[in-house]
Amino acid sequence: MEVLRDLGKNVENEAYLHATEQDLMGENIFCTSLVGEELGRMKSWGKHPNSRAEHLLSSPSFMNDLPQTFMEPLLFKTACSRGTNARMSTQYLSHEEDSEGVTSTCLDKLTNKEIKIRSKYLVGADGGNSKVAENLGLPFEGKMGVGGSMNILFRADLSKYVAHRPSVLYWVLQPGADIGGIGMGLVRMIRPWNEWLIVWGYDINQPAPEVDEKFATKVARDLVGDQKLNIELLSVSTWTVNNMYAKKMSKGKVFCAGDATHRHPPSNGLGSNTSIQDGFNLAWKLAYVLKGCLLYTSPSPRD
C-alpha cells in the first residue's frame, strides 16, 4: 500500500474503497468444512494487538485484501490518466535491441495484424510463462510443476457459515486435501460473504482433470459442507505449483519482473505484493537513469 501511496494518495484511497478492510480479514480458520468441525484459529493479518501496534507505528498505510480483479483496473486507469498509451488484446511476439532502444513486435489480436512498438526499454511483466524471459534466455533455477491445483470461482451467500467468524482464508482438511496443490483445501473470500475462490489440488503425475460445472459444484459443496448449496459458477481453471526463480533479471535494455522471474505460490503475501515491489523497484531506477541521475545497477534478483 505504501507503493500505491507513492503513486498518489488518491490511488491509495481508491484501493481502500474496493478492498476488504483489516478487521474483516479476520483470522486463519482451519476446519473440516465451513459447516463442519472447526479445528482451530490462528491470529493473522496484524490482528494480534502487538502486531497491530507494530504496523501502526511503522507505516501510514493499512493492511487490506484487494483481489487482482479490482487492483488491475485501478492501476490500468491510473496509468492511462497519466499519459500511458495502453493497449489491450495485444500479444508480445519478439523484440530487437539496438544502441538506442528496443523494437518489439506484437500481435493486435483484434485485427490479427503485427505491429511494431519502439521504446527506450522493454519490461517483461508477462507472467509465469513469460515469452520475454524465454526470448532473453534468462537462466532459471528450480522446478516447474511440483504440484497441481484448480481454481473454482463462484458466487454463493455463505454468510450464515462465516459472518460470525470473518476470515479471508478458510483452510479445509478433508481426505485427498494433501494431494497436489498447496497441501490443504482452501475457501478464499473474494467479496464478503458472497463471492469465493476455492483452491483444490490434483495429482501432478496425472493429466489435469476436466473441471466442468458438475465437478466444480461438487468440490464447492464438499468444502463448504452443504450438499444443497446453490452456487453461481463464474470460472474454473487448473494451474501448477512452481518453485523457480530467475538468476538474472535483465539483459541489456530488457528487464523482467513479477511472476516472469519468480514463480511460486502466492501464500504468505508472495502474490501481487512481490510483483508490485518488483515493478516499483524497477520503475524508480529507470526513471532516474532517464534523468541521468543513476548509473547501471546489478541485474541480480537481490537488487
Q: Where does each model-flagged region fall?
A:
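Active-site-adjacent segment of FAD-dependent monooxygenases/related oxidoreductases
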Residues: 2-73
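Conserved FAD-binding catalytic core of PHBH/FMO-like flavoproteins
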Residues: 9, 77, 121-243
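Helical element adjacent to the flavin cofactor pocket in flavoenzyme catalytic cores
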Residues: 66-87
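A conserved short coil-to-beta-strand element within the FAD-binding core of flavoproteins
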Residues: 88-102
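Core beta-strand elements of the Rossmann-like FAD/NAD(P) dinucleotide-binding domain
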Residues: 112-120
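FAD-binding beta-loop-beta segment adjacent to the flavin cofactor pocket
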Residues: 240-256
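Internal hydrophobic alpha-helix adjacent to the cofactor/substrate pocket in enzyme cavities
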Residues: 276-295
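Conserved small/polar residues in nucleotide/adenosyl-binding loops
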Residues: 296-303
